[in-house]
Amino acid sequence: MIQMTVLHLKFGKKGTPMKQYLEALEYILEHGKDRGDRTGVGTRGVFGYQMRFDLRNEFPAVTTKKLAWKSVVSELLWFLEGSTDERRLAEIHFGKPREELVGKRTIWTANADKQAKDLGYVNTDTIKDLGPVYGHQWRTWDAALGFVDQIAEVLENMHYDPNSRRHIVSAWNADRVNVMALPP
């Protein structure tokens, strides 16, 4: 059964975001190559498939299934904070102090309980450090002369040069991948 969520989305040049998404899935099913992955389940993919969305007029939301919007927004806010503590994500998501969230899980809990713990990071009921994951890389990128706050730099640069092609944020810090609970 397919659950449909109705969203008001305007048409872009190539159709709605959902139409582009479904066309991408069809293309991947027909032309994709099966690959192994770290989970042992495997994936099917194609190289370089692109979709483009004009965010001034539309939002690329999947509408053929329930969208975990609260989880998406919570995780994004957590990344923007630069936090590496999975329990902070739980606070944002559930809106309660971490002491009241013992046993509550987020999308990152399993990573904190397995990979991060194996890497030697703090893992208690109220603190679950993940190492220098996405938000840390966005807000505290290790650089030769200190740290770079990529989000602050992009926001500042967009103000002064909105047409620049250099507004880039990356979480792929090759020097830190081996100490991340879940590398990008």
Predicted regions span which residues?
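Methionine residue identity
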Residues: M1-M4
